[in-house]
From Swiss-Prot:
Keyword set, alphabetical order: Cell inner membrane, Cell membrane, Ion channel, Ion transport, Membrane, Metal-binding, Sodium, Transmembrane, Transmembrane helix, Transport
Domain of life the protein comes from: Bacteria
The species this protein was found in: Agrobacterium fabrum (strain C58 / ATCC 33970)
Record protein name field: Fluoride-specific ion channel FluC
Binding, Na(+): 75, 78
Membrane topology, as annotated: Multi-pass membrane protein
Pfam families referenced in this protein's UniProt entry, alphabetically: CRCB (PF02537)
InterPro entries with a match to the protein in the record: FluC (IPR003691)
Record comment: activity regulation: Na(+) is not transported, but it plays an essential structural role and its presence is essential for fluoride channel function.
Main location: membrane
Places the protein is found: Cell inner membrane
Length: 125
């Protein structure tokens, strides 16, 4: 139960940070481009790489610390960082084809799913 609380707390913190970046970018750059989303995806991807290396591998931090920081905070900040880590992990294991498939399938199918969800939502009423 403590693990769920750690992930939930971290997720709440990450979500608030994502919201604040969105507000800040909207005020700074306006609504014509999703700068906030781009920023959290890039920063989140950098941070997940840094934290996995430092917290998990070098500092040998507890599973609770990893759950809070990586799954919780960064998961709440951006799920794109998890996607990026999974793709790089496959690549580093030598599964180049599987990594490429994962990247393409994730992007193409996710975008198609958004279109499908929009279409369904628009046709329900």
């Amino acid at each position: 139960m403590i693990n769920i609380a750690l992930v939930a707390t971290g997720g709440a913190i990450g979500s608030v940070f994502r919201y604040l970046v969105g507000v800040w970018s909207m005020r700074l750059a306006g609504p014509n481009f999703p700068w906030g989303t781009l920023a959290v995806n890039i920063v989140g991807s950098f941070l997940i790489g840094l934290l996995v290396e430092l917290v998990a591998r070098r500092l040998n931090a507890s599973i609770e610390m990893r759950l809070f920081l990586v799954t919780g905070v960064l998961g709440g900040f951006t799920t794109f960082s998890s996607f990026s880590l999974d793709a790089v992990s496959l690549f580093e294991r030598g599964a180049l084809g599987l990594s490429a498939f994962y990247i393409l399938a994730s992007l193409v199918v996710s975008i198609a799913a958004v279109f499908a969800g929009l279409a369904l939502g628009r046709n329900l009423f």
